[in-house]
Amino acid sequence: MPFTIDTARSIFPETLAADVVPATIARFKQLSAEDQLALIWFAYLEMGKTITIAAPGAANMQFAENTLQEIRQMTPLQQTQAMCDLANRTDTPICRTYASWSPNIKLGFWYELGRFMDQGLVAPIPEGYKLSANANAILVTIQGIDPGQQITVLRNCVVDMGFDTSKLGSYQRVAEPVVPPQEMSQRTKVQIEGVTNSTVLQYMDNLNANDFDNLISLFAEDGALQPPFQKPIVGKENTLRFFREECQNLKLIPERGVSEPTEDGYTQIKVTGKVQTPWFGGNVGMNIAWRFLLNPENKVFFVAIDLLASPKELLNL
């Protein structure tokens, strides 16, 4: 029976993803807008004690600058309302603009808002604000998970804000400029204990070099990529857009893996290692598994990227 994207998702079923992440995000979305904003603020303050967040580059922020300045010029009450509108996914011009941005621009926008709050330029969370019992329980959960999981929770919480893109009709996606690939002389080839497959090694090397055109050439025409806690992205065009919008300047540090032949001439390969993002650099390495299914032509038919469970989660199983 030939593989489908759906059946491919079940390769290496023993892989233990960080279930605490989607569970925490689901609980977060049930909170009031005020509690969501306060929780993000308190969580960032908490993270700031142990994690250094890198300032977004100017190229990222040029697209958000007008919106940020618009919010700065509002009254404190209007500023609070604008942020609540984002959390409530209200249909406003700011929420529509926000919805069109790539995840990195959204993250940069919230970074700048946090800086403005610190400087007193934007209405902060009211002094003495008390989180609801549910929000406080979520904050305690976030405090107890590892840094890579904290980042993923907070990222997904803010990325999903703004007006629902499915209701926008046709709209212009806004993403930061694509950085040029690294020169060949500057690239360092990865080595993975237990894996010598050229497609997998090139996948890692090309992604580390921001060489997205050569990266996408490794995929089958009907291939798919499944980001952590998301549905598969199918087709080369959609996958290439994902790489360009969400994977610039990542540092993949694969460590070891296993390769197994499977039915119909396909090969399944699992690699584990770490990924560092430009937002947090070497401060935080997210524990990742890559689950590849390669077709008989050695092209990527499917790859799932899993944020792995922490040692603490594994002990609780």
Curated annotation (Swiss-Prot):
Q: Which SUPFAM superfamilies match?
A: NTF2-like, Orange carotenoid protein, N-terminal domain
Q: Name one GO cellular component term.
A: plasma membrane-derived thylakoid membrane
List, for all copies, the residue spans of the domain called OCP N-terminal: 18-169
| Binding annotation for 3'-hydroxyechinenone | L37, Y203, W290
- MF GO annotations: chloride ion binding; photoreceptor activity
How is the cofactor bound, as the UniProt entry phrases it?
Binds 1 3'-hydroxyechinenone molecule per subunit.
Alphabetized Gene3D superfamilies for the sequence = 3.10.450.50, Orange carotenoid-binding protein, N-terminal domain (1.10.2090.10)
Topology of this chain in the membrane: Peripheral membrane protein
Report any one BP term from Gene Ontology.
light absorption
Protein modification: Proteolytically cleaved into a red 16.7 kDa form named red carotenoid-binding protein (RCP) which lacks 15 residues from the N-terminus and approximately 150 residues from the C-terminus.
Main site of residence?
Answer: membrane
Has keyword Cell division?
A: no
Q: Where is the signal peptide?
A: none
Q: Where in the cell is it found?
A: Cellular thylakoid membrane
Cofactor(s) required, per the database record: 3'-hydroxyechinenone
This protein's UniProt keywords: Antenna complex, Chromophore, Membrane, Photoreceptor protein, Phycobilisome, Receptor, Sensory transduction, Thylakoid
Name the Pfam families for this protein: Carot_N, NTF2
Entry annotated with the keyword Thylakoid: yes
Q: What do we know about how this protein assembles, alone or with others?
A: Homodimer.
The entry's function note states: Acts as a blue-light photoreceptor and photo-protectant. Essential for inhibiting damaged induced by excess blue-green light via a process known as non-photochemical quenching (NPQ). Binding carotenoids improves OCP's intrinsic photoprotectant activity by broadening its absorption spectrum and facilitating the dissipation of absorbed energy. In the dark or dim light the stable inactive form (OCP-O) is orange, upon illumination with blue-green light it converts to a metastable active red form (OCP-R), inducing energy dissipation, quenching cellular fluorescence via NPQ.
Q: What is stated as this protein's family in its record?
A: Belongs to the orange carotenoid-binding protein family.
- State the name under which the record lists this protein: Orange carotenoid-binding protein
Q: Which organism is it from?
A: Limnospira maxima
Q: What is the lineage of its organism?
A: Bacteria, Bacillati, Cyanobacteriota, Cyanophyceae, Oscillatoriophycideae
